[in-house]
UniProtKB/Swiss-Prot annotation:
Protein name as it appears in the record: Phosphoribosylaminoimidazole-succinocarboxamide synthase
Keyword Iron in annotation: no
EC annotation from Swiss-Prot or TrEMBL: 6.3.2.6
Reactions listed under catalytic activity: 5-amino-1-(5-phospho-D-ribosyl)imidazole-4-carboxylate + L-aspartate + ATP = (2S)-2-[5-amino-1-(5-phospho-beta-D-ribosyl)imidazole-4-carboxamido]succinate + ADP + phosphate + 2 H(+)
Gene that produces this protein: purC
Species for this entry: Pyrobaculum calidifontis (strain DSM 21063 / JCM 11548 / VA1)
Keywords attached to this entry: ATP-binding, Ligase, Nucleotide-binding, Purine biosynthesis
InterPro entries (alphabetical): SAICAR_synt/ADE2_N (IPR028923), SAICAR_synt_PurC (IPR033934), SAICAR_synthetase (IPR050089)
Family from the record: Belongs to the SAICAR synthetase family.
Record-linked CDD domains: SAICAR_synt_PurC
Enzyme class: ligase
Entry keyword annotation includes ATP-binding: yes
Gene3D superfamilies: ATP-grasp fold, B domain (3.30.470.20), Phosphorylase Kinase, domain 1 (3.30.200.20)
Length: 240
């Protein structure tokens, strides 16, 4: 890569400016509770980077524009620089996670009649609060037109991922996306991995929820390895 300048370091990734674009390096660490719990997880970075690579490529093939450029083994991806508002977009197919806290009458894993799209202001110190669509526009995070475009992209991406993993008999529960502007165009950014979605296979988590529930970082890495295998198998079935 040659020249590299650290631009940002978060809980799961470090981002470097290079001549070719931004290099997103995935860490061998896992956190929960907005960083309150943190453990070393050797091998996690490489697994998350490769999984994100495969899923970005898959989504691009399904018409979802992303910031992804190329995989940089073993644990990084090269991406286009983007202007990213502090906004998380969650698509839920079933009741789980924080949804159950605000809607206590819902039973875990109850399917929704149609996917629910949520917007959260991204701020760990505030625990990423849920905000209204009107809030998104009034705060200047997105224009009304951009908001509609983001909802459409999020639903299309989430539905494509759900379809992918259904081919290996896994239940895609929900997913968290981030979007940014590249040359005036809204694109999917950040990562798409077990850190950003919930996937149940045979009733077991192959995502970060396993760590949230158990605190077992070693076991999480083993499940991320299995997630990568499942992803490759699912993709091979898409090509048939």
């Amino acid at each position: 890569m040659g020249f590299m300048e650290l631009v940002y370091e978060g809980k799961a990734k470090a981002v470097y400016k290079t001549r070719e674009g931004l290099l997103m390096v995935f860490k061998d660490e896992v956190t929960a509770g907005d960083g309150a719990r943190r453990d070393k997880a050797p091998g996690k970075g490489a697994l998350a980077a490769e999984t994100s690579t495969l899923l970005f490529q898959y989504l691009q093939g399904r018409g979802v524009t992303t910031h992804y450029l190329m995989f940089v083994p073993p644990n990084a991806i090269l991406v286009k620089p983007a202007q990213v508002p502090p906004l998380e977009v969650i698509v839920r197919f079933k009741a789980y996670g924080s949804y159950l806290k605000r809607m206590p009458k819902a039973k875990p894993l109850t399917p929704f009649a149609k996917p629910i799209v949520e917007f959260h202001y991204k701020d760990d110190s505030l625990h990423d609060p849920l905000i209204l669509e009107d809030d998104v526009v009034e705060a200047g995070l997105l224009t009304a037109g951009e908001l509609a475009a983001v909802k459409d992209m999020a639903l299309r991406a989430a539905s494509a991922l759900r379809e992918l993993y259904a081919s290996v008999d896994c239940d895609f529960v929900d997913v968290k996306f981030e979007f940014g502007r590249v040359g005036g165009e809204l694109v999917l950014v950040d990562e798409v991995s077990g850190d950003t979605f919930r996937l149940l296979c045979g009733g077991e988590h192959f995502d970060k929820e396993y760590y949230r529930k158990t605190g077992d970082a070693v076991g999480l890495v083993e499940r991320y390895a299995k997630l990568l295998e499942l992803t490759k198998l699912a993709l091979s079935r898409q090509k048939v």
